[in-house]
Amino acid sequence: YGRSSAFRLQPDLNCAERGGERLEGLILKGVGSFYTVLDADGTEHVCKARGRFRKESISPAPGDRVVFTHKTGEDGSIAQILPRKNLLTRPAVANVDKLMIVMAASVPKPDLLLVDKLLLQCAQTGIVPALIVNKCDERERETFDAIFHQYAASGYALHAVSAHTGEGLDALRAEISGSVCCFAGQSAVGKSSLLNAILPELSLAVGGLSRKTERGRHTTRHAELWLAYGGALVDTPGFSLLETEAIEPEDLAALYPEMRKHAGECRFAQCLHVSEPGCAVKPLLDNGKLSRERYERYLLILEELKEKRKHRYD
């Protein structure tokens, strides 16, 4: 595990023109204008990005496969970013397979609006999400049950885990095996503790809660990629707000799996599932087949998107 496992993750990533100091590599992290790049031999190189990336408004990100030049005793230079399959922003991470959305079973209270926005980002970028409820040893079981109820109809993987006792970690390791997995969520939900439990050699700094606000103190400063379990783990800085990407209001419902599978039953093709006659989704709220709490957050996001569009064309 760790960095010595080099390119089991990228078996097709080979050195190119080694004699000419032109190599392919994988960005592990970026701090300021410097990037740590791992080559196919497992050697780390400190590189800077060429100026043309700034002109093109493109920034390298952890997870990027790149072509770089390197001379002994000098910093390398990133010459090319190879095609990405996706890019998460704030913080930037490229080529992600799965997003592990971490919540706490106790404090801080789960911000399910943030969770829903992260799920939307996954739907837009083709990333497979999984919901992780950490701190289950604190026995706030009703929190886990409430979360399970709200997302059961969506079909997302849901894991109850404890970084402290090890509960659920074997199933989580199986979930992440062979994939590039990004761990995200509010501050102080235990992302770093969870990653330390999964891969002890990380020794990531762990923060606590502010006593006044019960909100987390940020301990992760930069997104960083660690190779493990035939894939990679990424710890991202905690955040409390996430902007939705450019989604048209009419397209929002299709990003909710539990609504999408019933959309063809609605009378109108572009039913927003708000007050339209012949809507097939709203009756499912009344019989408990869909979560009313998640639906209410859908309405909040829908109004947010309508406001954004209105201001866009004002």
Where are these regions (language model features)?
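A conserved segment at the C-terminal end of the G1
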Residues: 192-204
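Short, Lys/Arg- and Gly-enriched loop/turn segments at beta-strand edges
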Residues: 73-81, 109-111
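Helix-rich effector regions associated with P-loop NTPase G domains
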Residues: 33, 51, 57-72, 82-99, ...
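Short, structured beta-strand/loop micro-motifs enriched in basic residues and often containing a Trp
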Residues: 43-52
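SH3/SH3-like beta-barrel fold
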Residues: 35-39, 47, 68
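Canonical P-loop GTPase G-domain recognition
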Residues: 138-189
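Structural detector for short beta-strands of small beta-barrel domains
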Residues: 21-31
